[in-house]
Amino acid sequence: FLPDETLLMTSGEGFEHREDAQSLTSELGKVLRFDVDGKPRGLAGKGPNTRTRIWSYGHRNPQGLVHIPETDEVLLHEHGPRGGDELNRVFRGENYGWPLVTYGVDYSGAYVSPFQRAEGIREPLWTWTPSIAPSGMAWYNGSRFPAWRSSLFVGALVNREVRRLEFRNGVVQREEALFAELDERIRDLRVFDDRIFILTDSELGRLIEVLPH
């Protein structure tokens, strides 16, 4: 939920319908925005005084979505095909490129597109190649872990670790791998009341609270 009590929700492009991510008549491959009663709060529709639920488009498989209170921004990560996982800053009406541009290739090794960037396409804040398979995501700007202020935590399923992206003035300054010693798939992360929690998945999955040294 955003501060105005509207809801953002993501949708994938359905694997076999990748071109629909570019279509404004399809809700596949989109970030959608609506009120709690379901009323669309996205882009203008075709009729007068109508709206769609589409907020941004050109997404492949968006998953993590987080609102940054300090700047009122929304960050989103999404899975690329083979390589090309992305972190994006979400803006109303912006095109994020899939499948016209990508930093990855198809699972067969063939090109999805020969282009990594194009005019009119919003470029990602950060990319991961090879893929890390990003999972849960959480923003931290508290006082309990002062060295981690202004950091985005992203679960990395493939690497079985957490990636910390350090931000300064809205730009990623560096990336750090954490908690690899757990050797567990990181499914989700949450920040609550200045506390950081990690959820792992498996038959022995755990909910772990991170404690200061």
Where are these regions (language model features)?
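Beta-propeller domain segments
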Residues: 4-8, 13-176, 184, 194-198, ...
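Short alpha-helical "switch" segments that flank and position catalytic residues
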Residues: 189
